[in-house]
């Protein structure tokens, strides 16, 4: 739990709750399944019950739902990212050691935002699936992954490439 009390702004007066859990299992020598689930909620403590946009939860990008651009899981009519007071996301990833410090990853990511401060933003989970390769260096993996959006909305691109340094989780 994080607390924030703005110095000169009532917009930064809130409680932020977060839960992040991870699980890893290796049923075979060269195969690891990695699972992650995250939840967050912001409780406004100011009289207007409004939180500054830079303090809201956003989803999309290399850290969570990889089929989407950074923070673009939900967006407004002007194509600007929309944040929310609550966030739920999860990932299941298979990591396959191909030898020679190369790893293949297959994944599915899903996430949902809720309790928007603006109207006309749809609710519900958005999901992506994808694959990528990582080169395992002595200081951590460097990778290139592509996430495909499942159940694309009208006008959306099919997915997104992401370059990563380190594991997503």
Locate the predicted segments by residue:
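C-terminal outer-membrane beta-barrel translocator/porin domains of Gram-negative envelope proteins
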Residues: 1-98, 106-107, 114-115
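Repeated loop/turn-to-beta-strand initiation elements of outer-membrane beta-barrel proteins
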Residues: 28-33, 100-104, 135-144
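A generic structural micro-feature
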Residues: 82-84, 123-125, 155-157
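Residue-level signature of outer-membrane beta-barrel architecture
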Residues: 23-25, 94-96, 135-137, 148, ...
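Short beta-alpha connecting loops at secondary-structure transitions
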Residues: 53, 115, 126-127, 145-147, ...
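C-terminal beta-signal and adjacent terminal beta-strands/loops
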Residues: 108-121, 139, 154
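Outer-membrane beta-barrel "beta-signal"
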Residues: 131-142, 158-169
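A short alpha/beta connector and helix-capping loop motif
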Residues: 119-132
């Amino acid at each position: 739990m994080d607390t924030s009390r703005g110095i000169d702004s009532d917009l930064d007066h809130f409680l932020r709750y977060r839960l992040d859990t991870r699980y890893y299992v290796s049923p075979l020598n060269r195969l690891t399944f990695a699972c992650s689930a995250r939840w967050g909620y912001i409780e406004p403590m100011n009289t207007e019950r409004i939180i500054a946009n830079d303090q809201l939860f956003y989803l999309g990008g290399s850290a969570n739902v990889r089929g989407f651009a950074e923070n673009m899981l939900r967006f407004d009519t002007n194509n600007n990212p929309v944040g929310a007071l609550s966030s739920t996301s999860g990932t299941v990833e298979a990591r396959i050691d191909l030898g020679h410090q190369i790893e293949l990853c297959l994944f599915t990511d899903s996430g949902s935002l809720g309790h928007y401060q603006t109207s006309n933003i749809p609710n519900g989970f958005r999901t992506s699936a994808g694959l990528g390769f990582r080169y395992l260096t002595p200081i951590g993996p460097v990778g290139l992954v592509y996430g495909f959006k499942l159940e694309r909305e009208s006008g959306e691109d099919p997915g997104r490439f992401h370059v990563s340094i380190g594991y997503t989780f």
